[in-house]
Amino acid sequence: MIHPSAVIDPRAELGANVSVAPYSVIGPDVRIGDGTEIGAHVVLEGRVAIGARCRIGHGAVIGGVPQDFKYREGIPVGVRIGDETVIREHVTIHRATREGMDTRVGDHCLVMATSHIAHDCAVGNHVILINYAGLTGHVVVEDRATVGGLTGVGPFARIGAFAYVGGCSKVNKDIPPFVMAVGTPATARAVNVIGMRRAGIDAASRRAVQSAFRILYLSGLAPATALPRVKGELGQHPLVAQLIAFIEASKLGVISRDRRRGPAEIEETTL
């Protein structure tokens, strides 16, 4: 159902069974997949592609001009959202700044109310952003990561797959896959065993990641010594190899553990 008060440019492409609630505005370069629901007072502007069976909450603004001085009006940039993703009330997602690029949100994500995804971010599949989470420009959030409420993620930071960032944190370095982190700045606290278990990752794989975490964060070794040890002892395991590759690719550096707490105080969830 398209409410008569909605303003939809005739050049916009709406799939089958798309619904648009009152007073929403949809621009000419917008494409919406089958079965997607657009709430009231939503603004979709610029080049926006939304997949099938998504829900866009009241007051969300998607495709807005980025808050970045280097942006130039008229360049071909946009926002791309996958299938079955939920964008809740008053979320803002800004278009990219680099020509030919999109700010991206994957499939099966949940972006809770009033969260912000800035220009050129790349959010993977099955990601959860909790209320008031803020991603600044060029942030990467890999599959199945969770970012807690009121958490700010700094420019170019990366959050690895299955990572869990606690609420009210400040992220200014990369958070490796499978790691739970919290604080200002965020520091490593544990392995996200619960998230891994819920995703069906077997106990042997969880133990391998936990062993790598102990070497990296609980052994007292310097990173330059700990990482080669992880490679030598556990690098043959696919998930540990993923962890190693993420750390080696880091440009900002990865988070450390909280130096105010001894290794015995770092909580380790039962496998």
Where are these regions (language model features)?
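Structural signal for interior beta-strand "rungs" in well-ordered beta-sheet cores
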Residues: M1-T187
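Terminal amphipathic alpha-helical/low-complexity segments used for targeting or macromolecular assembly
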Residues: M1-S5, P10-R11, A16-N17, R53, ...
